[in-house]
Amino acid sequence: MCALQYLRPDLLYLKPYDAVPAPAADKLDANEFPLDWPAGFKQKLSLLWEKGIPSNRYPDAHHRGLKQAIAAYAGAEPEQISLGNGSDELIRSLLIATCLGGRGGILVAEPTFSMYAILAQSLGIPVVRVPRDPETFALDLERCQQALREHPIRVVCLVDPNSPTGNGLTAAEWEWVEGLPEEILVILDEAYFEFSRHTALPKLAEHPNWVILRTFSKAFRLAAHRVGYAVGHPQLMQVLDGIRLPYNLTALSQWAVQMALEHAEELLADVTLICQEREALYQALQELPGVRVWPSQANFLYFRVAGWDPQELQRAWQELGTGVRYTGGGLRLTVGTPEENRRALERLRQILQ
């Protein structure tokens, strides 16, 4: 029993989003981009901070210029854009806008991005979990449909490509998504769009109950700045802007995103390198005895090793200097630089000998 009687009892069992348990020389656990911004970009941003951003003034609360820049990049209109302190804030706002007051729960197909369930639970929103196919990690559409019949689902949460497994939605899954009733909000999380190059954005006009989430933390290398954006129906974006906390993005973060979009071609050129490294890692992992690795459309690979407890393998790898993430009963390895990937493979071979 909790000594703090004012606390909600259900929150006592809520586990926070966890990262790698200890520092590692090579951080391949968080799906970050392995290359920092070019020095010239960072110097320009530093100069902006020094000369152009008054510390005593609040930042732009409405993100007007940023919405225009993002809309131009994404192929949308500014009124279709809402910005958050990372996609996490947007997810939380979407759940507040749809599910609070006993209006329904969310459907998640696991394994998937854990923050959907964590944020829903923190708000007292029911979470209905449906397991994915254990071989392909495809959605079990029959069980998803059963969940819709048996529970008052208000939001369906889909990550495309999925994290941690890396697979994109299939044609059959898209057909199911397109058939969902308009009273159900469909969150299509495209955090890894720049790697997969697949987007549902062209179909948004046909589906006012769809909303796309993206982030600048991955391919644009701005994880430290925590900026995500939603693309959807203007009325939904207006509600999200009303729900979010005021001044949710720092002035420096807004300038960083503006710079990233101005130099998008240069920054995104290195995505090709990551995809090439991903395929090389995939082939190398396939050749190791006992390793089952799944193909990926993102900047990470998901795998399991026969005869090994994945958490024990994570710890052994960590001790040798490579941080990986344990999730969903397996390990997720972020694609790093060629040197980081080489060291990761060497260390794994050493462990498996």
From Swiss-Prot:
Q: Does the keyword Transferase apply?
A: yes
Cofactors that this protein relies on: pyridoxal 5'-phosphate
Q: Which Pfam families match?
A: Aminotran_1_2 (PF00155)
Which InterPro entries would you find in this protein's record?
A: Aminotransferase_I/II_large, HisP_aminotrans, HistidinolP_aminotransfase, PyrdxlP-dep_Trfase, PyrdxlP-dep_Trfase_major, PyrdxlP-dep_Trfase_small
Question: Which of UniProt's keywords are assigned here?
Answer: Amino-acid biosynthesis, Aminotransferase, Histidine biosynthesis, Pyridoxal phosphate, Transferase
Q: Which GO terms describe its molecular function?
A: histidinol-phosphate transaminase activity; pyridoxal phosphate binding
E.C. number(s) listed in UniProt: 2.6.1.9
Q: Name one GO biological process term.
A: L-histidine biosynthetic process
Question: Which reactions are catalysed by this chain?
Answer: L-histidinol phosphate + 2-oxoglutarate = 3-(imidazol-4-yl)-2-oxopropyl phosphate + L-glutamate
In the UniProt record, the signal sequence range is none
Q: Which CDD domains does the UniProt record give?
A: AAT_like
Q: In which pathway does it act?
A: Amino-acid biosynthesis; L-histidine biosynthesis; L-histidine from 5-phospho-alpha-D-ribose 1-diphosphate: step 7/9
Modification type N6-(pyridoxal phosphate)lysine: residues: K218
Q: Which superkingdom does the taxonomy of this entry point to?
A: Bacteria
- Its EC top class is transferase
Q: How does it assemble?
A: Homodimer.
Q: Which family does it belong to?
A: Belongs to the class-II pyridoxal-phosphate-dependent aminotransferase family. Histidinol-phosphate aminotransferase subfamily.
What PANTHER family does this protein's entry cite? Answer: HISTIDINOL-PHOSPHATE AMINOTRANSFERASE, HISTIDINOL-PHOSPHATE AMINOTRANSFERASE 2
* Classification via NCBIfam families: PRK02610.1 (NF002726)
Q: What is this protein called?
A: Histidinol-phosphate aminotransferase
